[in-house]
Amino acid sequence: MAAFDYNVKDLSLAEAGRHQIRLAEYEMPGLMQLREEYQQEQPLAGARITGSIHMTVQTAVLIETLVALGAQVRWASCNIFSTQDEAAAAVVVGPHGTPEDPQGVPVFAWKGETLEEYWDCVDKIFSWGDELPNMILDDGGDATMAVIRGKQFEEAGMVPPVEEGDSDEYQAFLGMLRKTLAEQPGKWTAIAESVKGVTEETTTGVHRLYHFAEEGVLPFPAMNVNDAVTKSKFDNKYGTRHSLIDGINRATDMLMGGKNVLICGYGDVGKGCAEAMAGQGARVKVTEADPINALQALMDGFPVVHVDQAIGDADIVITATGNMGIISFEQMLAMKDHAVLGNIGHFDNEIDMASLLHRDDVSRVTIKPQVDEFTLPNGKSIVVLSEGRLLNLGNATGHPSFVMSTSFADQTIAQIELFQNDGRYVNEVYRLPKILDEKVARIHVEALGGTITELTKEQAEYIGVDVAGPYKPEHYRY
């Protein structure tokens, strides 16, 4: 029996997961070098990290890096479909355990959770017995939101009732908080006071952090990892360029060459999507609300249109905005028969999934896991991937290991920075110091066999930088 609690699909999958983790380590030089650099120092000794990121093979390497640097960890996935069950099992069993005697860390994640199960897993990663977590590592902001809203509702003495129009997910979230307030009064307030900081992985979660800060309810310092250059300009673009195609291929077996594709959003993720589809020979159009991004799309050769102008001709529609209400039910009615609709933003509200799932005049047939055909009132069908959630993780396995090495090296460094500098940071949102961003880049340049030119002292003085960096001012746009 394990000396800790966990909830994963099947521990017998651990061996398969361990083989994949071992291979991923070779593709994740950032994390492996940080292990080597900090193993003796143990900079995270005493850290109790509540982690909420997609429970993939790459995340397993991150978790075991945090543990190698001294941290204790409890983990859940941040998406109901994104867990790789073999990775979750391998992390619970650990490098030296067996399915009969797990010696890893507590994980609460499996592919295909219900919304109620998902929020129960979030509750579990904050339950440390006689201790409290003192760090959060988040992706999308759900874990952080649980602490902040839980504390607010404890102060108010009640969880607000469900209102008409509340999403299924928000109803499940309120249900979890209602249960914890009844069974463990004061839990979230105590956690808010214990946590030294949160590091946030993704655009959507960062938006939430800034909103909490503006609202004046952020109870601890936050590090915006998403906007580290080695995250947003690599994971968001190059990772998506790889994983979007992987997800669509696994889901549909559709040839993309010659197809009409509509990409909604031309931020870093949208750029990766458009480039990937164009590389497959698709005819790509882009929608965009920001005129700067729209101009970039045009200069890159992609027509910029309104959704209504292009959705009727599109064979594939992908949302990548991080916003809500991008594709309405009325726009779905205008789509081609058997067109494919997917999302690669963090939440499912970019697409009006509520109408598809709850209208009486819409029927659903599951083709295979995370691939559903919805027949609309006009008789046409559309194929929806991962119920409007992240298709690259629901229909495939997410971004490749090497690009996640940059993001997760950023996360590890940010955790060390906040944990070791308790008191230096106030309850605001910070960005990773540029010198650390450059450190992560340098590791990966060397891993790919690149040679970085070293400035002479005179050259460095001429442009006003240190020979060792940082080489660009904070306002520089890469």
Curated annotation (Swiss-Prot):
Binding site for NAD(+): 202-204, 236, 265-270, 288, 323, 344-346, 392
Name of the protein this chain belongs to: Adenosylhomocysteinase
Gene this protein is translated from: ahcY
Pfam families: AdoHcyase, AdoHcyase_NAD
Pathway: Amino-acid biosynthesis; L-homocysteine biosynthesis; L-homocysteine from S-adenosyl-L-homocysteine: step 1/1
GO biological process: one example: S-adenosylmethionine cycle
Protein source organism: Corynebacterium diphtheriae (strain ATCC 700971 / NCTC 13129 / Biotype gravis)
Manner of cofactor binding, per the entry note: Binds 1 NAD(+) per subunit.
Record function comment: May play a key role in the regulation of the intracellular concentration of adenosylhomocysteine.
Needed cofactors: NAD(+)
Family note: Belongs to the adenosylhomocysteinase family.
SUPFAM superfamilies: Formate/glycerate dehydrogenase catalytic domain-like, NAD(P)-binding Rossmann-fold domains
Domain of life, source organism: Bacteria
GO cellular component, one term: cytosol
